[in-house]
Amino acid sequence: MPLARDLLHPSLEEEKKKHKKKRLVQSPNSYFMDVKCPGCYKITTVFSHAQTVVLCVGCSTVLCQPTGGKARLTEGCSFRRKQH
């Protein structure tokens, strides 16, 4: 284990492991994503840490269910992280 570490230029892996407030530049862990329904192929915008069950607008199937942290996507759903 090296004693000398560059604190001003940490590696990307080190920064991702840190708590969101202890990073060099603070950034949230949550994001919005576009989820495609496997039945009707409609796209719905969902928060990554959704706290309620999200249903499809077209066919009323469950797209994701809440857990303690991130929402769990239903099997067959595909998603894309939205750019801010």
From Swiss-Prot:
A zinc finger (C4-type) spans 37-59. Gene3D superfamilies: Zn-binding ribosomal proteins. GO terms for cellular component: cytosolic small ribosomal subunit; nucleus. Residues 1-16 have a biased composition (Basic and acidic residues). Its cofactor is Zn(2+). Pfam families: Ribosomal_S27e. This is Small ribosomal subunit protein eS27-like. The lineage of its organism: Eukaryota, Metazoa, Chordata, Craniata, Vertebrata.
